[in-house]
């Protein structure tokens, strides 16, 4: 799991390097999270994790505060999540997560990205079964057994725990995100998460043929340019 996770982080670093795009994506996600679960991070663990992630990605405090204030104001856009799946160059599998106020527009925009990169958008569930939908927490700790014990005491279902050079990475089903985070912060009050998120991790990878690489990069670039796109997951290796 760790390798796929690291590939994903490397992909983010390469493709989501425009600050304004990063701010916009976090702003929209924080707005939706605060609107759904409340604007108090102490009572909304998903929001707390999201704010911590945003700060680590150097999103300014005013961007975070504005999104929460907007959510608590009651008015504003009505964003809903949308997920699209398909096959890219070399038959790699791609999942695109969006937050949209116009699903028809967003579907058309995403489909256009696939079409113009010799790729094919598929039906819901066409590739998601080949990914694990995971909650992932990474942090510095010198005792793997203590982490496992904390998870067991809280009755959290853990998929995997990796320990390497003092870095512990806990993988759990996405539905266990809140319980796992609460268990970790309760057991280790000074915990500083290096990763705290929910992702789709591929169960197998697909090598991109050299001739297909330009089209794969075109697909990623076009999707990243869409305002409604929040996350892109794939199983490509290149």
Curated annotation (Swiss-Prot):
UniProtKB keywords: Cytoplasm, DNA-binding, Transcription, Transcription regulation
Cell compartment(s), UniProt: Cytoplasm
InterPro entries tied to this protein: Integrase-like_N, TACO1_YebC-like_2nd/3rd_dom, TACO1_YebC_N, Transcrip_reg_TACO1-like, Transcrip_reg_TACO1-like_dom3, YebC-like
Keyword Cytoplasm listed: yes
Main location (coarse class): cytoplasm
Gene Ontology molecular function, alphabetical: DNA binding
GO biological process, one term: regulation of DNA-templated transcription
GO CC annotations on file: cytosol
PANTHER family documented for this protein: TRANSLATIONAL ACTIVATOR OF CYTOCHROME C OXIDASE 1 (PTHR12532:SF0)
Homology family: Belongs to the TACO1 family.
Annotated protein name in UniProt: Probable transcriptional regulatory protein IL0164
């Amino acid at each position: 799991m760790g390798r796929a996770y690291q590939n994903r982080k490397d992909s983010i670093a390469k493709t989501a390097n425009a600050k304004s795009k990063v701010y916009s994506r976090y702003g929209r996600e924080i707005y939706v999270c605060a609107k759904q679960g409340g604007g108090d991070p102490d009572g909304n663990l998903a929001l707390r994790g999201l704010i911590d992630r945003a700060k680590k990605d150097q999103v300014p405090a005013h961007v975070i505060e504005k999104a929460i204030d907007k959510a608590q104001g009651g008015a504003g856009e009505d964003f809903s999540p949308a997920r699209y799946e398909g096959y890219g160059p070399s038959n790699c599998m791609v999942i695109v997560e969006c937050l949209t106020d116009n699903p028809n527009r967003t579907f058309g925009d995403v489909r256009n990205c696939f079409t113009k990169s010799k790729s094919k958008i598929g039906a819901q569930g066409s590739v998601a079964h080949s990914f694990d939908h995971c909650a992932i927490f990474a942090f510095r700790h010198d005792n793997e057994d203590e982490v496992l014990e904390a998870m067991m005491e809280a009755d959290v279902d853990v998929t995997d725990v990796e320990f390497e050079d003092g870095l512990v990475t806990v993988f759990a089903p996405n539905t266990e995100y809140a319980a796992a985070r609460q268990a970790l912060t309760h057991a280790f009050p000074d915990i500083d998460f290096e990763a705290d998120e929910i992702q789709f991790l591929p169960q197998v990878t697909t090598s991109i043929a050299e001739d297909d690489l330009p089209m794969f990069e075109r697909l990623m670039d076009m999707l990243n340019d869409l305002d409604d796109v929040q996350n892109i997951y794939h199983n490509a290796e290149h």
